[in-house]
């Protein structure tokens, strides 16, 4: 009997003893893992997974986007929020932790729906339900030379586009005027696709921007709130487009920046796009990707953000202003958000 007991102890992972001195199989390592995947054909992002295995009591799904889920039955439906080829790892486990895994690549196409837009199709002042204004001429932390107003001389809608006009004129102690619109307190969102169709102003010293700031800027300040520069442009670099991400540790001159070159930036309309989710942020012009930032929970890009549209003059980015500059117009055809 002592020999039998000793055998049972050293063989615990393989056999168990019964009263008659025989043995019965213990929980065995899972085998025969099969994963059936059904991608819904409506481009909704919904995917059905059915996993089966011998000797498995639970199934863990790594959806390939940083999301994990444990499912006892092995059957689960998951909704992806953006298109991509996702490497999904399925692990079948038994009660003792023994496991077997399989990885399948799941191609997903997600058709996003338009959830908010301003088409700028009503002439006059911009829609006050969508836009407010920053007013003043304090340099705005960048040694800028303009005074921002909400006057019709500096901002108006006509012919189906928003016009932001920078002018050389003495006003409130500044040598230039312009406008800066923002959707703060009126519209903000987290994740999705942004498209802005715009024609940039011409003139050395102009600094137009399409950008976003975190809703919590009033409580945590910049750069803790995060900043997304979808498009910035120096008038001295006619067709060079800049995108930047500012956040703690990487801001100002140390921001995450990239550039691209396009044709006719100031004479033709181009579509500036941000694709933003919990895993990545992609910026493109006319569907040409040129700037990417991996997203994660340690940086401030998992909260509500609002829009800003403006022309600055000079400053740390815009540089020296051409003495012959008189006026320049930033035209925006639409701002659209898809989710």
Located regions from the model:
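Sec-dependent bacterial lipoprotein signal peptides
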Residues: 1-16
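GH16 jelly-roll
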Residues: 17-50, 58-63, 70-79, 83-96, ...
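Sequence context surrounding c-type heme c attachment/ligation sites in exported
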Residues: 55
């Amino acid at each position: 009997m002592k020999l039998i007991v000793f055998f049972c102890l050293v063989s615990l992972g393989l056999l168990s003893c019964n009263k008659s001195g025989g043995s019965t199989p213990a929980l065995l390592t899972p085998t025969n893992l099969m994963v059936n995947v059904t991608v819904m054909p409506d481009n909704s992002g919904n995917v059905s997974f059915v996993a089966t295995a011998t000797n498995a009591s639970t199934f863990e799904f790594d959806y390939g986007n940083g999301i994990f889920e444990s499912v006892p039955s092995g059957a689960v439906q998951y909704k992806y929020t953006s298109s991509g080829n996702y490497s999904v790892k399925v692990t079948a486990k038994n009660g003792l932790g023994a496991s077997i895994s399989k990885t399948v690549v799941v191609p997903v196409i997600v058709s996003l729906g338009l959830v908010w837009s301003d088409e700028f199709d009503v002439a006059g002042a911009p829609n006050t339900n969508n836009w407010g204004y920053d007013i003043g001429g304090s340099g705005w932390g960048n040694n800028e030379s303009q005074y921002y107003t909400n006057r019709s001389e500096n901002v108006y809608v006509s012919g189906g586009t928003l016009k932001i006009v920078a002018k050389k004129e003495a006003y409130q102690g500044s040598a230039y005027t312009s406008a800066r619109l923002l959707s703060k307190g009126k519209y903000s969102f987290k994740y999705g696709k942004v498209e802005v169709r715009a024609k940039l102003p011409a003139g050395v010293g102009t600094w137009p921007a399409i950008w976003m700031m975190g809703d919590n800027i009033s409580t945590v300040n910049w750069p803790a709130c995060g900043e997304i520069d979808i498009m910035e442009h120096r008038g001295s670099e006619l067709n060079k487009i800049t995108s930047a991400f500012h956040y703690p540790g990487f801001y100002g001159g140390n921001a995450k920046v990239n550039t691209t070159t396009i044709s006719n930036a100031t004479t033709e309309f181009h579509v500036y796009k941000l694709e933003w989710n919990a895993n990545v942020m992609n910026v493109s012009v006319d569907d040409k990707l040129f700037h990417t930032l991996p997203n994660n929970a340690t940086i401030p890009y998992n909260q509500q953000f609002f829009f800003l549209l403006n022309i600055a003059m000079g400053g740390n980015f815009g540089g020296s202003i051409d003495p012959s500059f008189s006026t320049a117009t930033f035209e925006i055809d639409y701002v659209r958000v898809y989710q």
